[in-house]
């Protein structure tokens, strides 16, 4: 499990058990929780399951009538669309509570083909739904997708060392200048 965290880029998390319940050396940051959620919600089957508002449990010998379980994530599930907690763009998520972490809320939302994940840790009862909704509204209002090439004239290449016939350069030493002709490669040392 911790290997998967590393693969996802999580740097401030460690799990001791698969349940997520308290452990002496178990912790997760909000950022890492968002990375985990983003990877989870790339799985369409998981999105379908976790976005279900109810699920009917079949009858058993212990419970001959069966029963229905309902989702508790108020941004995703509501009987009242005017509820201050409901957010129609919220597709799925998870609620939780631990003594150390308090009320926790992870929400996955999609609007105009943009996907956002909000994470609330140490939230207050019911208020964490309001806070999660506010984070998503802020994100969709404040951030846009755009093609850098349409707006910028210089690009930094990344974090890897680049080997060229003139030597090795750190990415921060190079930039791409799209105004250069193709024959000049557009790379130059900054």
What are these regions (language model features)?
Residues 10, 24-27, 31-190:
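Domain-terminus/edge residues, biased toward the C-terminal soluble/receptor-binding domains
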Residues 1-13:
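Short, charged, amphipathic alpha-helices and their helix-cap/turn boundaries
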Residues 2, 17, 71-73:
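Asparagine-centered polar/low-complexity signal
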Residues 13-23:
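Surface-exposed aromatic
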